[in-house]
């Protein structure tokens, strides 16, 4: 049998407007629960309205300063983080069994995606074995957290572009006290905006051999 036939199709949804975290959280869960072995994998690229999200390992004491930011309990891995405008969020709804990936493969893929994306703009980033995410000179530029149900993933990564870092100052980001965050705009003068990076992500997946057909939907 031709190997191409066995590869899944991928739908990339590029959301233009800001989206509510809680609503998309429920949509991700619903898609994961209802999909079957024939369902295409999906990748959602978007920005959220400002929000704090607690992962499964999150602790209340990691929220340092009361604020008017909503706090949403999530079922992803990891601890507390901030999402908001100027931060690119990518959600991976992948059938890991079909891709023949394990959790480590998914995490490494997401980290390498961020590293490769910003390397194009002369930013040298790296991952750490003991602290998931992507770093530049010990400052964190990209975070990630996943949930796996019946071999299928949802949630994903967040890459800081030109977001307001004050949201991170109300928390211990990812549970690490004093962890300094950094943005692409801090490192590159003529930095790529959200739409450009979303196009870069689409090109990245079209070049990958893991998927048969890549369809892009603008929303």
UniProtKB/Swiss-Prot annotation:
Signal sequence region: none
Protein name according to UniProt: Octanoyltransferase
GO biological process, any: protein modification process
Entry EC no(s): 2.3.1.181
InterPro entries attached to this UniProt entry: aa-tRNA-synth_II/BPL/LPL (IPR045864), BPL_LPL_catalytic (IPR004143), Octanoyltransferase (IPR000544), Octanoyltransferase_CS (IPR020605)
HAMAP family according to UniProt: LipB
Binding site for substrate: 76-83, 143-145, 156-158
């Amino acid at each position: 049998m031709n190997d191409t036939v066995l590869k899944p199709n991928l739908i990339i949804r590029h959301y233009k407007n800001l989206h509510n975290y809680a609503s998309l959280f429920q949509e991700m869960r619903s898609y994961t629960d209802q999909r079957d072995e024939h369902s295409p994998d999906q990748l959602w690229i978007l920005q959220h309205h400002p929000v704090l999200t607690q992962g499964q390992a999150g602790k209340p004491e990691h929220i340092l300063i009361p604020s008017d930011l909503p706090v949403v309990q999530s079922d992803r891995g990891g601890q507390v983080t901030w999402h908001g405008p100027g931060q690119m969020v990518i959600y991976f709804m992948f059938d890991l069994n079909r891709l023949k990936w394990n959790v480590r493969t998914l995490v490494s893929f997401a980290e390498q995606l961020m590293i490769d994306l910003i390397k194009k703009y002369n930013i040298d980033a790296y991952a750490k074995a003991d602290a998931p995410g992507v770093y530049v000179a010990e400052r964190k530029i990209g975070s990630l957290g996943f949930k796996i149900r019946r071999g299928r993933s949802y949630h994903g990564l967040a890459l800081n572009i030109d977001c307001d870092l004050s949201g991170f100052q109300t928390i211990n980001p990812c549970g690490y006290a004093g962890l300094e965050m950094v943005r692409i705009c801090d490192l590159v003068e003529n930095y790529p905006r959200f739409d450009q990076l979303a196009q870069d992500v689409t090109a990245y997946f079209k070049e990958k051999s893991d998927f048969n057909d890549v369809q892009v939907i603008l929303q």
